[in-house]
Amino acid sequence: DMHDFFVGLM
């Protein structure tokens, strides 16, 4: 989901 997307960028 959107949260996992941002976690992937980190």
From Swiss-Prot:
Keyword Cytoplasm tagged: no
Alphabetically ordered keywords of this record: Amidation, Neuropeptide, Secreted
GO cellular component, one term: extracellular region
PROSITE patterns, per the entry: TACHYKININ
GO terms under biological process: neuropeptide signaling pathway
Methionine amide modifications at: M10
Compartment annotation: Secreted
Disulfide bonds: none
Domain of life: Eukaryota
Cited function: Tachykinins are active peptides which excite neurons, evoke behavioral responses, are potent vasodilators and secretagogues, and contract (directly or indirectly) many smooth muscles.
Family as reported in the entry's similarity comment: Belongs to the tachykinin family.
Descriptive protein name: Neurokinin-B
Source organism (scientific name): Pelophylax ridibundus
